[in-house]
């Protein structure tokens, strides 16, 4: 009996050893390191793309300063993602705009494009783009302002990732305006009423000041819409809707008439450093300029020159101004979708948005960056929920780009004399027809 018990015990011990030996030899589980902290957000230190080595071509319709910043950010991306090579190409915005308006624009076979927001819906309708919804994950879904995202939606999808914005402002020459009124008068104190705008050209001539009443980009229809919004004290896309025109008390017609009748007093050349010096010396009473251009100009002028000028952002208190944004879109023909999405996400990170702002003056698109902690002087965080930049665009469908091109051609024609004032008034009213918001 004892021998039988010993045999049973020996068999049981042998079975136990056989059962436990695989577990004893199994490797210990690997503990993943914690994500890095600090800064605005943590970016990956190694490539998460998960594809074969990818070669991306990027065409950027941006200015030289913006392109240089993009190049530096792209180099940092390539260090984090050694399996992804990226070739950057730049297209001058003015030349690209002319080619776009002539239906000759081409992205040169690129996988990714940086383009004006107004182009996005037209490119999506043409079947040129991949939806960008997958780039918006986590807090990125709610971060961009509605004024921007509304321009990038069509047919239920978001077709681009917003990178920056640069709305128009007006810069006043306060010395010129002060010379137009006696002490104690305020008619020509900015911002001007429609009546003061109408009287401004004649008042300048009456006082003998050799100054234009307005300096503005004669090639950009968004500059024109910015001034009309300033004149009428209305949202900048109101002239593009029948409802907006019906409720403006005839302000659109008054604005168009003033531009035609006083076009000889409009300065429409490029806003070069030489222009800003002459503007400070009394070349014009007011200039409509991009926010980044205005802030950069005042920084580069001497103290005495800059003292005569005042940037007026009060238009941003209205429901809507054109954001003037550039967004990243993904080509439907790319062979590296995942790598393209990762690049788009990282190029629009909060850290890169702040770098864009500090180096180029173009504003971030993320709500949470508008706090004192980040040093952004433009106080968009104080905007109401229904004001800019939180109000969707009324004109955001695929027809926007072509209609703006028509308005821009007519606007340029008025200023260079190829379009007579009477024809301008008739055609402009027709072109400012109703847009339908396609969200």
Question: Which positions does each model-derived feature cover?
Answer:
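Extracytoplasmic "Venus flytrap"/periplasmic binding protein-like
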Residues: 80-144, 180, 278, 285-286
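Hinge/lid segment of periplasmic solute-binding proteins
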Residues: 115-169, 306-311
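Glycine-centered hinge/linker elements that transmit conformational signals in sensory
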Residues: 199-201, 237-273
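Extracytoplasmic/periplasmic solute-binding protein
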Residues: 159-163, 168, 195-244
């Amino acid at each position: 009996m004892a021998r039988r018990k010993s045999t049973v015990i020996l068999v049981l011990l042998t079975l136990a050893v056989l059962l436990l030996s695989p577990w004893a030899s199994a490797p210990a589980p690997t503990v993943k390191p914690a994500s890095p902290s600090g800064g605005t957000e943590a970016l990956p230190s190694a490539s998460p793309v998960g594809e074969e080595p990818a070669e991306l071509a990027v065409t950027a319709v941006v200015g030289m300063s913006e392109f240089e910043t993009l190049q530096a950010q792209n180099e940092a991306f390539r260090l984090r993602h050694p399996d992804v090579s990226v070739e950057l190409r730049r297209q001058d915005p003015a030349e690209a705009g002319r080619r776009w308006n002539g239906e000759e624009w081409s992205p040169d076979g690129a996988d990714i494009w940086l383009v004006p927001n107004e182009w996005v819906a037209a490119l999506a309708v043409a079947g040129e783009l991949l939806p960008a919804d997958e780039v918006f994950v986590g807090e990125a879904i709610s971060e961009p302002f509605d004024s921007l995202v509304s321009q990038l939606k069509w047919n239920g999808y978001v077709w681009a990732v917003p990178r920056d914005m640069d709305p128009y402002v007006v810069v006043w020459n306060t010395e010129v305006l002060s010379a137009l009124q006696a002490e104690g008068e305020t008619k020509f104190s900015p911002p001007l009423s429609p009546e003061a705008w109408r009287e401004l050209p004649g008042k300048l001539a009456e006082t003998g000041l050799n100054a234009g009443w307005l300096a503005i980009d004669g090639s950009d229809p968004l500059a024109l819409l910015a001034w009309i919004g300033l004149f009428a004290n209305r949202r900048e896309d109101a002239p593009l809707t029948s409802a907006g025109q019906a409720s403006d008390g005839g302000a659109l017609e008054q604005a168009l008439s003033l531009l035609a009748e006083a076009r000889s007093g409009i300065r429409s050349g490029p806003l070069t450093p030489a222009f800003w010096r002459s503007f400070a010396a009394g070349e014009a009473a007011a200039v409509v300029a991009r926010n980044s251009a205005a802030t950069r100009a005042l920084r580069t002028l001497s103290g005495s020159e800059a003292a005569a000028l005042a940037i007026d952002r009060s238009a941003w208190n209205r429901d809507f101004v054109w954001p003037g944004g550039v967004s990243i879109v993904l080509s439907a023909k790319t062979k590296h979708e995942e790598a393209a999405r990762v690049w788009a996400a990282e190029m629009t990170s909060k850290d890169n948005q702040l770098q864009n702002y500090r180096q180029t003056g173009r504003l971030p698109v993320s709500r949470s960056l508008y706090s004192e902690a980040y040093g952004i002087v433009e106080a968009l965080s104080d905007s109401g929920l229904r004001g800019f930049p939180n109000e969707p665009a009324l004109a955001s469908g695929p027809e926007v780009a072509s209609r703006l091109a028509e308005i821009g051609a007519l606007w340029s024609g008025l200023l260079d004399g190829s379009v007579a004032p009477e024809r301008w008034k008739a055609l402009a009213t027709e072109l400012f027809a109703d847009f339908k918001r396609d969200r």
